[in-house]
Amino acid sequence: MYVVSFLDRANIGFAKQALQVSAGISDAAYAMGAGLFFITYAIFEIPSNIILHRIGARVWMCRIMVSWGLVSMGTMFVAGAISFYILRLLLGIAEAGFFPGIILYLSYWFPNRVRGRVLGLFYFGAPLSFIFGGPLSGILLAMPAKAGIQGWQWMFLSEGFMAVVVGIWAYFYLGDKPADATWLPGPEKQALLAVLEAEEQARRRHGSSAFPAVLMDWRVLHYTLIYFLIQMSVYGVIFYLPTEIAAFLGKTVGIEVGFASAIPWVCALAATYWIPRTADRHQNHRFLAVLVLAVSGFASVLFPAGTPIIALFALCVAASGFIAVQPLFWTFPTSYLADTAAAGGIAFINAIGALGGFFAPNAKVWADVHFRLHSAGLYLLAGLTLVNAVLIAFVHQGKSDGKSDALLSI
């Protein structure tokens, strides 16, 4: 599901040049349209996640994926800036609640002590989508027009259709909570439920469980600022990675750039496996998150200043860090929030954080124009990454319940 989600997020980056040629969209209009998705996505996040909490993941995840797949398919009909803006706004409404819904859903099933590595496995979806999605998008873009449909239109049609199919599959596959899992043996189910209930009670005693009061909790606001800056870093890479790689290769965005764009995400896949597991093993999520962001920030500074080899190496380090730090981050709010505060609070953090995806391309364009330097925007985003490393150093880190040690290893 997450692979398909990120395919949908990334295809707009691959379609940038084609949209500008076919639909007459300027750099500024592209940046605005790419970012508008996050406005409606943020507005509808909280109500969507509360609905999921009430009616269950199976039905709601199906609704989200089918609707966003249909809207994504509709992007093939973009004919100018206005239609591009409208479809990006509709896509934000359709996809709202997917990501925080998954984070909430995993908190129903996995205790604190193993949640980092579980979230790391979930986050495999991002680099996997870029590893396979980059070449796939490049191949589709390079297709000659068939039946009056150009390559970039085939890309949106094919990848949107995948979301519809996976959404229907999710309806029949997902179970809402462990208590509903008929495949889980009785003793294991009871042990898991006991651990999860003990942690829920601990969160109610020491964390926050009331919504909407959680929105004024200083820790939640701290988490939100951190996640906002993480998303600025992530989307600064996602939206511009294909065109930046094309620039230093001296190519147009197509098959070769698609394969080259997959290299940083192969590195990110390895990092997303190893870093969260290491953090869970040593229970040092905060320290590793600070280290990862600091290294990624310095790598981002090297990217625009280096040779093609150094630039590609810097992209590999930055992409790895920006993806791998996210499962570490989500262990903080999920160990602090309980009940409806978890549903609303996680959605709030993700909703405001997702606005980083709106500000990243626009901040990059502003900095490039203001300082009359193509790499100024990348330096700005790199600096914000280093600031974020400092913010994480002061984050509140929830405590695992000792009973979770008894859980079977994953």
Model-derived segments and their meaning:
Residues 24, 56, 77-83, 94, ...:
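Helix-breaking motifs and short loop linkers at transmembrane-helix boundaries and internal kinks
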Residues 43-82:
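Conserved MFS/SLC helix-loop-helix module at the cytosolic interface between two early adjacent transmembrane helices
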Residues 53-65, 280-293:
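Cytoplasmic membrane-interface "Motif A"-like loop-to-helix N-cap segments
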Residues 87-124:
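Cytoplasmic helix-loop-helix junction between adjacent transmembrane helices
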Residues 117-141, 162-163, 350-360:
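Glycine-rich segments within core transmembrane alpha-helices of 12-TM secondary carriers
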Residues 283-332:
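C-terminal transmembrane helical hairpin of 12-TM major facilitator-type secondary transporters
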